[in-house]
Amino acid sequence: MMNSRISIIIALSCIMITSIRAYDPDALQDLCVADKSHGTKLNGFPCKETLNITESDFFFAGISKPAVINSTMGSAVTGANVEKIPGLNTLSVSLARIDYAPGGLNPPHTHPRATEVVYVLEGELEVGFITTANKLFTKTIKIGEVFVFPRGLVHFQKNNGKSPASVLSAFNSQLPGTASVAATLFAAEPALPEDVLTKTFQVGSKMVDKIKERLATKK
């Protein structure tokens, strides 16, 4: 009986350790401002020397106003993550502002390292996500309303209105990562084997080439 209990405790401990390591590491000190000039590579960033830390390491003004939208998708994402705010290192949080032109789309994508919560600053958006069972959850959200996109699931936002729209996004990761579905498949470098794409989408090579060509211009 004792051996069984010990085995269960060990198994639960392993599960807890695995769960903890699946998210950003917890901070073990007051500050660990990212030192991006350091050559060391690790899961995160090494800490800047305390004497070199300034208030600027915790400040970013880049999401205070709408971004200039010049993409063919009609949207612009301005991240406020550890790459812009070094003081976010080890804190497991970040923000982003997304601005949409009328009819603008933030195309289907995933965040492999974070759940996302969006808060509507301006306009009205159609938003949604798809589960691994191919179930679509979609809703129209307006100013002051919130919608959640679970971690790792494909999701999108679209401005169906005739005026601009904006949201503020919050993430439970200092660097959530973004993988666009279309770009991941059709604009990978090196390119995904063509027969993989033709068989997956049940289309011919000419169609694959046409999609690649169009995506290449959508920067």
From Swiss-Prot:
UniProt xrefs under InterPro entries: Cupin_1 (IPR006045), Germin (IPR001929), Germin_Mn-BS (IPR019780), RmlC-like_jellyroll (IPR014710), RmlC_Cupin_sf (IPR011051)
Pfam families: Cupin_1 (PF00190)
Domain Cupin type-1 stretches: 59-209
Glycosylation sites per record: N52, N70
GO biological process: plasmodesmata-mediated intercellular transport; regulation of root development
One GO MF term attached to the UniProt entry: manganese ion binding
Broad class of where this protein is predominantly found: secreted
Cysteines engaged in disulfide bonds, as pairs: C32-C47
Keywords annotated in UniProt: Apoplast, Disulfide bond, Glycoprotein, Manganese, Metal-binding, Secreted, Signal
Signal sequence, renumbered to the chain: 1-22
Function in brief: May play a role in plant defense. Probably has no oxalate oxidase activity even if the active site is conserved.
Subunit field text: Oligomer (believed to be a pentamer but probably hexamer).
Name of the protein this chain belongs to: Germin-like protein subfamily 2 member 2
